[in-house]
Amino acid sequence: MTAQSQNIVETPSRVRAHALGVNAPELAKYQDEPAQMRSGAVGKSGYLKLRFAKREHRSILAEMERRVPSLVQKALYWDEEIPELPCVTMISTSGCILQGDRLATDVHVEAGACAHVTTQSATKVHMMNANYASQIQNFIVEEGGYLEFMPDPLIPHRNSRFITDTTISIHPTATAIYSEVLMSGRKYHHADERFGFDVYSSRVAAQNLAGKELFVEKYVLEPKVESLDAVGVMQTFDAFGNVILLTPKEHHDRILARVPAHFDIKGGIASGATRLPNDCGLVFKALGIDSAGVKAEIRQFWKIAREEILGVTLPEQFLWR
């Protein structure tokens, strides 16, 4: 093993991905090893490292590391509203997340740099009969940096178990917009697919670059233990969008003034925004009957955030998105 490969194996985020679910109470019943291939084996321990840096006329993807099944090829510059913005698409060579997968991602935006990170399509968490899948995401945004992390929805198949932990370390002058969309499952595929997963556990936390905690949000969904169709949870909706916007306080009031609460049970959409603790930013949540409605609400919030923070809007949406 080369020194570089050894360093990647021992990367803190990757080590955390392997340890994340071991002591999680919600996964205590799912510690058995898969019969096919042990958890975290070669090909099941993915890693991505993306470091963005500012150069004279644009930001660039200055450093990249990748280990299967995680893959990134190169940065493209397709955002006509921000021509200097490197856009990177994360790819999975396995096509979905499988039992025993341990995934880790490190994204570092250096001072004054910008970046947009997305996925090529929805992420599917495959059916499981043993163990679980885990994911660590670690974001660092330095002074004056700007990061958009806007992946496509995650679709948990029935009997799947998935735990994810995200940490955003950010300078007070920087901006990060982090999005996640969770579907109820493949509701048109099988009668037991809608909320048929065993566990979905998500933790998102933010801190300043000195390590001072700004906020923590964690939720554990176990639809076979307690129905998610209750009022105050999903209330018959099938898609959940969660957007964290960390940005200087001077932008908060202007953004909130343009994002009124919206509840339309007949139209199948509900959304709203509020402030995060410690004046660190805003949180926007949306519920819908399908991913299209939730993605449209998120896109509108994203558009407003861009306009108020950067003074530019979003480009026209690609037809295939």
Swiss-Prot record:
Gene it is expressed from: ureD
Lineage start: Bacteria, Pseudomonadati, Pseudomonadota, Gammaproteobacteria, Enterobacterales
Major place of residence: cytoplasm
Record-linked InterPro entries: UreD
A Gene Ontology cellular-component term: cytoplasm
One matching Pfam family: UreD
Annotated protein name in UniProt: Urease accessory protein UreD
Keywords: Chaperone, Cytoplasm, Nickel insertion
Cellular localisation: Cytoplasm
Molecular function terms, GO-annotated: nickel cation binding
Record-annotated membrane-spanning stretches: none
Subunit architecture: UreD, UreF and UreG form a complex that acts as a GTP-hydrolysis-dependent molecular chaperone, activating the urease apoprotein by helping to assemble the nickel containing metallocenter of UreC. The UreE protein probably delivers the nickel.
